[in-house]
């Protein structure tokens, strides 16, 4: 099955996201048949269900962009809690529910990791089992995770500005469309490491590549632009290969508001030189466009 993890906007809300995370999945051979597995993690009491965290009583402490990785048959949720220390939770099943393991343990300066928030965590389990976390808001950093715990950040492993916030012509980061804003998502394709992120020109998902997980990274282009250009109208997402086809998962705005985002997906192609040609934003999902040469019943 294919699983999607993300923050959860409430319809008609005046705020981003919610105090719960949900998971959706579909069979790899039927990508139009999605089911919701319900709440997988929460930071507030929810009816008969207690909070999964005991340090998030404030109403403004809600769940933003998470990530989930699998290692040794366990599924690890990396939760970004606004205005609170982030944490890692674990499950035996990809759909959860996830049980709290621990807050992050780290010696990185609070200035770098935003007082332990670890904003927009993206996690990569490499082929050799080593695990890396990439984070940041208006400044990026990465570090290695101790796989004995999956929540401890290894000492002296932090690298700042993995994607720069000021122009750096050596790496091709020379305009606002290339510089870092937020939304790290690491992937490995063959021997190449990709870091997908939201640049200062927010509506896009840009990407950079390196031959090492620790960089240095080189700007390669953008994958999709969700078509808005106003404050807060940024994009989050990543790429995945399903049945031999690569896709970009991302979100777009709904009904002219930035607070009710909806998930989208487009087919992409990774060329032999590692570049990804930009694709158009659509609402097709996994369907193909209508054939203009065939009658379509409606």
Spell out what each predicted region is.
Residues 1-298:
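Carbohydrate-active catalytic/glycan-binding domains of CAZyme proteins
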């Amino acid at each position: 099955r294919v699983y999607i993890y993300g923050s959860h906007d409430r319809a008609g809300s005046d705020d981003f996201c919610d105090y719960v995370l949900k998971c959706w999945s579909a069979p790899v051979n039927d990508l139009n048949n999605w089911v919701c597995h319900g709440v997988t993690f929460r930071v507030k009491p929810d009816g008969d269900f207690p909070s999964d965290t005991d340090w998030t009583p404030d109403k403004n402490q809600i769940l933003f962009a998470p990530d989930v990785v699998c290692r040794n048959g366990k599924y690890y949720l990396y939760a970004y809690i606004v205005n609170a220390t982030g944490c890692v939770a674990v499950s035996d099943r990809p759909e959860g529910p996830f049980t709290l393991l621990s807050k992050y343990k780290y010696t990185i300066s609070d200035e770098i990791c935003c007082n332990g928030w670890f904003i927009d965590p993206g996690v990569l389990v490499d082929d050799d089992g080593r695990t890396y976390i990439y984070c940041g808001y208006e400044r990026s950093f990465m570090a290695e995770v101790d796989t004995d715990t999956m929540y401890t950040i290894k000492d002296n492993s932090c690298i700042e500005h993995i994607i720069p916030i000021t122009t750096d012509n050596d790496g091709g980061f020379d305009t606002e469309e290339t510089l870092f804003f937020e939304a790290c998502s690491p992937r490995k394709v063959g021997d190449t490491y990709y870091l997908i992120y939201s640049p200062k020109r927010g509506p896009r998902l840009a990407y950079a590549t390196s031959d090492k997980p620790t960089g240095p990274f080189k700007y390669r282009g953008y994958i999709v632009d969700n078509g808005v250009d106003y404050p807060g109208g940024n994009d989050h997402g990543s790429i995945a290969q399903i049945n031999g086809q690569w896709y970009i998962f991302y979100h777009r705005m709904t009904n002219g508001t930035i607070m009710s985002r909806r998930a989208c997906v487009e087919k992409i192609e990774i060329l032999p030189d590692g570049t990804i040609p930009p694709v158009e934003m659509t609402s097709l999902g996994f369907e193909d466009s209508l054939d203009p040469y065939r009658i379509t019943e409606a």
